[in-house]
Amino acid sequence: MSETSFDVIIIGSGPGGYVTAIRASQLGFKTAIIEKEDLGGVCLNWGCIPTKALLRSAEVYHNMQHAADYGLSASPQFDLKAIVARSRKIAGQLSGGIKHLMKKNKVTVIAGFATLKAGQDAPIVIVDGTDYTAKHVILATGARARSIPQAGLEPDGKFIWTAREAMVPDTMPKKLLVIGSGAIGMEFASFYDAFGADVTVVEMVDRILPAEDAEISKMARKAFEKRGLTIKTETQASVKAGAQGVTATLTSKGKSETAEFDRVILAVGIVGNVEDMGLEALGVKIDRSHITVDEYSFTGVKGLYAIGDVTTPPWLAHKASHEGIICIEKIAGGNPHPLDANAIPGCTYCHPQVASVGYTEAQAKEAGYDIKVGRFPFIGNGKAIALGEPEGLIKTIFDTKSGELLGAHMIGAEVTELIQGYTVAQKLETTEHELMETVFPHPTLSEMMHEAVLDAYDRTIHF
């Protein structure tokens, strides 16, 4: 093959793209990956990883402020510039790690913006005037923040921010408006609140974290309001930037109020990066800025596939990675199981953390299941008390007939690390009896996972 001819070309190097490239190389494909910015995509450079670095700084600062609770003394101060610099350093370090992985796995990296035109086996990929050919082309172009210009909800890089601007603030805003209460919105609300900003969160529907179980959402709201956040649900926002800040009009149930804010963060969803690549001319089906694909990520256009945020929800990094592996293994002639969207865990890294997998209680009932529900509070767990984290809940949902674990929902310290236990249990179709008979180590937070199963069958021990 020539330097412009490959077995597989992947466009986009986020967690969908680079993972797929590595697996393609492992399967023996001559592979290239095309990236217009930094290796690692939005997730690694401007999303998942750097936000966790910021939130870690917020967590440490919060703990220092409460040092007396642990028999310690501290007079903490924060250096915003240093906090941001640490986050950026980590992103840069990991992007460099992806570069190393590409070299190690003999993946050719091509820098630039890719467009497509019709080809023989698959679309021809054009970068900076050079044609690249492959038998299979995989789109992993990701997504960007959604804007609503008619309501003034359009980033200006100064007063009205997307997540990217919110990650690199020059100063800490005194008053901050966060529009949207999904994972992105609540993580930034948690970060800025920790460092003293007066944060207001606006959500159109009747509860924050609307994708989560209603009971967990209610507990999250209570915890955030206890920390001092103002939360307005069933509220729409329109904003107008001025010389020194933003005037927001907040409307709920026909009544409007105006308020002034230093900054606004838009967290009202995402749109797929599908523009200016020539997809429409190829006949790619696009629904509301996201590409329609089948269970193996095939677009319907010969040799063309799409994975990750540019396709259908849930829009999660780990879903993109897994989709990519399924896609390339299918291309290689394997018979991988299609991805079960209901078995993908979701995590929100605010304080308190929120995590879930499977059906919510309402969804399970709507699906026609007769269910048993178990609950166990953090206050009943010795490790949680020792950590100084007594607020939280683990909730389980079982099918009464089969004993199948239908869903699990958590709020509290480190639940984003606990949820995978239930995810594995779901994948292995573990029954309630098998979970109840499993030995959990003591003292750990994971014991609550056991107790939440026991509670569904009236056998809980410690509460």
Protein language model annotation of sequence segments:
Residues 9-37, 49, 53-60, 332-333, ...:
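Flexible, glycine-rich terminal cap/loop adjacent to redox cofactors
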Residues 9-11, 114, 132-142, 179, ...:
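Short hydrophobic core segments
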Residues 16, 40, 184:
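Hydrophobic/small residue at the entry helix of a nucleotide-binding pocket
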